[in-house]
Amino acid sequence: MQQIMVSGTVAFLVSIFLTPVLIRYFTNRQLGQEIREEGLQSHLRKRGTPTMGGIAIIAGIVVAYVFTNILAMIQGVGGFTVSGLLVLGLTLGLGATGFADDFIKLYMNRNLGLNKTAKLVSQLAIALIFGFLVLQFPDENGLTPASTHLSFIRDIDTIDLGFGGSVFGIIVFLIFIYVVVSAWSNAVNITDGLDGLAAGTTAFVMGAYTLITFWQFRNSCDTAVEAGCYTVRDPLDLSVLCAAGLGATLGFLWWNAAPAKIFMGDTGSLALGGLVAGISVVSRTELLMVIIGALFVIEIASVAIQIGVFKTRGKRVFKMAPIHHHFEALGWAETTVAIRFWLIAIMAVLAGVGVFYSDWLHLAEV
């Protein structure tokens, strides 16, 4: 528990103090967010607001994770693990993609940033590397960071995406990992359209997973094989990483809350999406994450529905997509939408954690 608290605190401090440095840097160089003319008129006032604040979030996560594990190694109570490093690598890889996108927008005056092909290839390569590596590095018990089984609260034994390790099965698994990584990174990116919305929602999700992975650590099958135990390779280190994600997003949210002094940009949203995706895979809770991260699911689903219906029927389901803009178009104030969506996110988190804990109670009583 001490490691988790240290990680969250360090991440928060790094993020909350580094963010204003970035605000001053980008403001002095007159580098800010461009706002589309065809968008909501109320958002035009945000033109010129500094972006790329995700740098502070990533820095907070990295510094906290590294510092906490070095401290743990000195104290002889833990250290870096393969699972944590792989998720961190996924986060950094997608963060680098987002950074390139933001850099092109700001410094090369190309408002669309990376072209779709470059972004797709980058996400695909990062996801495939992550998907391959999470099946490597077995521990002394033969447990790898992830398995080819689909997972809800733990692996679902009857659904093996790897088809017993066949070449076809591994390809199917890698495709699945790409879908997971792409979906979550784009979902967080799409949600980042209102002041504080993506940062706040991610903080709720990371808070939930800090508890979930710590509970997996306390009830690990490595220490005692009993009803309700969890076969997760490195749950404590994952909890440390989740706490870093929680602290970093809260520190950034201090400056990103309405009216935002800075936006996280693709640098932050893609990185946080990678963190969400990676944690769901290595904690073996891919389907549970759909409940806990339901607001992200709603946001990306609204875009898919809008595009699908418009292309097939020539009609729009929402006034604007993603759905948070729909409510703004109805006349809701931006802060009203953000806070109500936070409430939805909190309810989703509570529901997901409740399902997780109820499962353990049920198995523990059997």
UniProtKB/Swiss-Prot annotation:
It is an enzyme of class 2 (transferase). One of its GO terms (cellular component) is plasma membrane. It is a multi-pass membrane protein. One of its GO terms (molecular function) is UDP-N-acetylmuramoyl-L-alanyl-D-glutamyl-meso-2,6-diaminopimelyl-D-alanyl-D-alanine:undecaprenyl-phosphate transferase activity. Its EC number is 2.7.8.13. Its cofactor is Mg(2+). GO terms for biological process: cell division; cell wall organization; peptidoglycan biosynthetic process; regulation of cell shape. The keyword Nuclease does not apply. It holds the Pfam family MraY_sig1. Pathway: Cell wall biogenesis; peptidoglycan biosynthesis. It catalyses: UDP-N-acetyl-alpha-D-muramoyl-L-alanyl-gamma-D-glutamyl-meso-2,6-diaminopimeloyl-D-alanyl-D-alanine + di-trans,octa-cis-undecaprenyl phosphate = di-trans,octa-cis-undecaprenyl diphospho-N-acetyl-alpha-D-muramoyl-L-alanyl-D-glutamyl-meso-2,6-diaminopimeloyl-D-alanyl-D-alanine + UMP. Keywords: Cell cycle, Cell division, Cell membrane, Cell shape, Cell wall biogenesis/degradation, Magnesium, Membrane, Metal-binding, Peptidoglycan synthesis, Transferase, Transmembrane, Transmembrane helix. The chain crosses the membrane at residues 3-23, 54-74, 76-96, 118-138, 161-181, 197-217, 238-258, 262-282, 287-307, 341-361. It comes from the Bacteria. It is found in: Cell membrane. Belongs to the glycosyltransferase 4 family. MraY subfamily. HAMAP family: MraY. Catalyzes the initial step of the lipid cycle reactions in the biosynthesis of the cell wall peptidoglycan: transfers peptidoglycan precursor phospho-MurNAc-pentapeptide from UDP-MurNAc-pentapeptide onto the lipid carrier undecaprenyl phosphate, yielding undecaprenyl-pyrophosphoryl-MurNAc-pentapeptide, known as lipid I. NCBIfam families: mraY (TIGR00445). This is Phospho-N-acetylmuramoyl-pentapeptide-transferase. It comes from Corynebacterium glutamicum (strain R). The lineage of its organism: Bacteria, Bacillati, Actinomycetota, Actinomycetes, Mycobacteriales. The gene is mraY.
